[in-house]
Amino acid sequence: MKKHAKVYYSENLVEQVNEFETSFEIKPLERGLGNTLGNALRRTVLSSIPSCAVFGVKIEGIKHEFTVLDDVIEDVVTILNNLKRVRFFYNPSVFSQNSIHVASFLGQKAGQIYARDIESHSGLKIVNPDLYIADVSKVGALKFELFITNGKGFVDFETNKKYVNEVISRLESQIEGSVLAVDSDFSPVLNANYQAVEINSASPIIEEKLNFSIKTDGSIFAKDALSQGAKILIAHLNLLADVENLNKFSADFFGDQEIKEEPIRRFSNSIDALDLSVRSLNALRRAQYYKISDIEKLSQDDFENIKNLGRKSVQEIMEKLQNYKNENKGEN
């Protein structure tokens, strides 16, 4: 009987753009398994990884999306389309299942409004702060609130409209207006592709290599998204493998507890966990620093040499980093 070859799994650093966009290589696989694994993983990471997204928007004074806003260049439909694209990195230990959180902009500035101007819950962090929202010519002309929940996959406007009606009594608000439902794209994975390549076509026994590339929205590392996708598949396959429990209902075959531990670990390892100002966070990301373990090694001089980090920002980072170390002393 032929022995199975040892399978080698690695990240392709040549094709890595950053921690959020990279590719992986698995080899050697038996002929046909490349497409089998690649297709299953791709579908799973695109549709089954939990995250959070906007499901409803309230704009002060607006009853429906065709209302005209004074002193704002964009119409309501355009603003809604921009707001539903705001992406959040969230802490699952704070953001419990089916809970609803609010992020808001209460008109405190005029000019061009970006996602970074939105104030959010402490368990949320906006990962695309440079997303353009609207151009306002007068302070106070535009005020809005975003209602955010967690979920998986894509939820359309009509489904969210029903959900808004169900939870309207739970929505706390500081402004007047109607809650307008929007589409929700919960998936933190923007793109996932695979290719199965024969690696020994001249041999009597042909084997394959699976190349799998993945790009996320910045709320989760690419390798963690792939890991979660694999765990979700394993949880389903374990159910099928348990032939002793045929015809029995398994209430926990998704292995929710195990799968949820991964985002929590991801939150604690990311610089997002330091709760830095948007300016400091963006400067570190542009310099390709994404993990706390990366910046722990830097001296004050190293921080001061990072572009767009002023003295106050350096002081903020070093203080927040020290606080983080003190709070996590003794943890591995």
From Swiss-Prot:
Reactions catalysed: RNA(n) + a ribonucleoside 5'-triphosphate = RNA(n+1) + diphosphate
Keywords for this protein: DNA-directed RNA polymerase, Nucleotidyltransferase, Transcription, Transferase
Region (Alpha C-terminal domain (alpha-CTD)): 259-332
GO terms for MF: DNA binding; DNA-directed RNA polymerase activity; protein dimerization activity
Gene3D superfamilies: 5' to 3' exonuclease, C-terminal subdomain, DNA-directed RNA polymerase, insert domain, RNA polymerase, RBP11-like subunit
UniProt keyword annotation of Iron present: no
CDD domains: RNAP_alpha_NTD
Coiled coil: none
Top-level enzyme category: transferase
Cellular component GO terms held in the UniProt record: cytoplasm; DNA-directed RNA polymerase complex
EC nos: 2.7.7.6
Gene Ontology annotations of biological process type: DNA-templated transcription
Role description: DNA-dependent RNA polymerase catalyzes the transcription of DNA into RNA using the four ribonucleoside triphosphates as substrates.
Subunit structure: Homodimer. The RNAP catalytic core consists of 2 alpha, 1 beta, 1 beta' and 1 omega subunit. When a sigma factor is associated with the core the holoenzyme is formed, which can initiate transcription.
Similarity comment text for this entry: Belongs to the RNA polymerase alpha chain family.
Protein name: DNA-directed RNA polymerase subunit alpha
Lineage: Bacteria, Bacillati, Mycoplasmatota, Mycoplasmoidales, Metamycoplasmataceae
Gene name linked to the record: rpoA
